[in-house]
């Protein structure tokens, strides 16, 4: 994010690191933060590092992604941990949170692995959009965390990016989806989802000889650049980055 003419990196780390940090563009640490114990719900000692164990669960802190609030603060998705969205001020001080683990009824405002998050400014007012991955949907919230709407029918949406009136959604099961400002699907890029769904043992992810140029295997993230090109990062055996060049 550019702040006062200077670029900064915001990074998350889960597993044994269980923290998030703000870095300069050259990699120097501005600050590093740990589990927001004031939010409640976390196991005792979850904010204490280093650690050698690696327990998982809804009482753990395993952050996955950021979204930047228009006021200079940010939202943080605890995507592998408590399944909540935390809000912080510009200095990394915890303010509030919303969301909870969902049950089989998949009620609005509850999550099952909220891996990705971004600010959707395609409408009249900016909204928080959450990639509710294991529930196969996107959910929209006000900047205060009030549930607004959702879109079902995705596979395993991992994150979201926005450019002009388009939303970009990497779907882990072999495709990247584009939505318009009305949240309607306008296209699936590199769609190989049928082959990925049939690969129950995930052999394709491990065997590069089975990858097909122009088709995606396991897109874990995607973003637009300043010219509207798309970059897709895939979680495969040795990793793969694909650039899709904007044509019009």
What is each of the regions a protein language model found here?
Residues 215-248:
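Blade-level signature of beta-propeller repeat domains, shared across WD40, Kelch, NHL, RCC1
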Residues 28-61, 93-112, 186-214:
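Surface-exposed loop and turn segments in beta-propeller and other repeat-based domains
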Residues 8-11, 73-77, 127-130, 166-169, ...:
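Conserved beta-propeller blade signature
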Residues 24-26, 89-93, 142-146, 180-184, ...:
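Short loop/turn segments that connect beta-strands within beta-propeller blades
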Residues 124-131, 151-195, 199-201:
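Loop/turn-rich, solvent-exposed surfaces of beta-rich toroidal or solenoidal domains
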Residues 14-15, 79-80, 122, 133, ...:
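Short loop/turn segments immediately following the C-termini of beta-strands
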Residues 1-7, 42-73, 103-126, 135-136, ...:
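Beta-rich, blade/repeat-based domains predominating
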Residues 21, 84-86, 96, 139, ...:
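WD40 beta-propeller blade core
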């Amino acid at each position: 994010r550019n702040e006062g003419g200077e670029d900064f990196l915001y990074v998350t780390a889960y597993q044994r690191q269980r923290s998030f940090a703000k870095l300069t563009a050259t990699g120097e640490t501005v600050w590093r933060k740990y589990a927001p114990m004031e939010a409640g719900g976390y196991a005792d000692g979850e904010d204490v590092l280093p650690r050698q164990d690696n327990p998982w669960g809804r009482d753990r802190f395993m952050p996955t992604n950021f979204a930047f609030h228009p006021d200079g603060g940010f939202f943080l998705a605890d995507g592998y941990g408590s399944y909540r969205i935390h809000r912080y001020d510009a200095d990394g001080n915890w303010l509030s949170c919303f969301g909870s683990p969902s049950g089989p009824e998949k009620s609005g405002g509850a999550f099952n692995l909220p891996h990705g998050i971004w600010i959707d400014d395609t409408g009249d007012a900016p909204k928080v959009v959450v990639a509710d991955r294991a529930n196969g949907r996107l959910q929209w919230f006000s900047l205060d965390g009030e549930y607004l709407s959702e879109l079902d029918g995705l596979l395993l949406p991992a994150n979201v990016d926005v450019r002009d009136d388009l939303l970009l959604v990497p779907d882990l099961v072999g495709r990247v989806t584009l939505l318009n400002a009305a949240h309607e699907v306008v296209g699936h890029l590199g769609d190989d989802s049928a082959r990925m769904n049939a690969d129950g043992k995930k052999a394709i992810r491990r065997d590069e000889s089975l990858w097909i140029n122009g088709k995606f295997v396991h897109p874990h993230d995607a973003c637009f650049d300043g010219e509207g090109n798309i970059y897709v990062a895939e979680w495969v055996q040795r990793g793969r980055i694909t650039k899709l060049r904007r044509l019009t």
